[in-house]
Regions:
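Iron-associated oxidoreductase/ferritin-like identity signal
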Residues: 1-175
Length: 175
């Protein structure tokens, strides 16, 4: 009987720097964290009757998980096994939809700062591969910021009373 041979293991690509690996591991953790934050918000919104907003925040959660997969896929293509970091438990209750909108906006600002700092560091070190990846994330952050800024602006325009929040919820759900 012929013994099964182990598949060929992909070698570590020397083009990827240790800084790049560390950053991408961190990026995976942060994108997974963002996904879990938005998932937690979505579940709370759903239980509070904000079905439109719940649907939107669930879509945000899935989008963030996709962003984590960008880095995972890249690391795997370079022969590096991505780490699966443990993440802290997320809140299960919120003050209301206005808090979720503002918290999401603040969260996206913090994520953008992380990515900008890493892009600056990559430029200084001449790590062109890492810089290119940072640019991909920064382009995505322009969209993320625009989305959350739109909801902050609409919250200010429509108000935080029940009628204004119901209108926002309907708009978030595409109704």
């Amino acid at each position: 009987m012929e013994t099964l041979k182990r598949p060929i293991k992909k070698s570590h690509n020397p083009m990827i720097s240790e800084d790049c690996i560390k950053y991408l591991q961190y990026r995976i953790q942060q994108e997974d964290l963002s996904s879990r934050i938005y998932l937690s918000m979505s579940m709370w919104l759903n239980n509070e009757g904000y079905t439109g907003a719940a649907k939107l925040w669930l879509a945000y959660s899935k989008e963030e998980a996709t962003h984590a997969d960008w880095s995972r896929t890249y690391l795997l293509s370079m022969g590096v096994t991505p780490e699966t970091a443990s993440l802290e438990k997320q809140p299960t209750s919120y003050i209301g939809l206005p808090q979720i909108i503002r918290d999401s906006f603040d969260h996206e600002i913090a994520i953008t700062k992380q990515i900008k700092d890493m892009a600056t560091d990559a430029m200084k070190k001449g790590d062109h591969m890492l810089y290119e990846l940072c640019l991909r994330y920064l382009k995505e952050q322009v969209e993320e910021h625009d989305k959350t800024q739109t909801w902050v602006d609409k919250l200010a325009a429509f108000g935080e009373d029940k009628v204004g929040l119901r209108f926002l919820d309907n708009e978030m759900g595409g109704d």
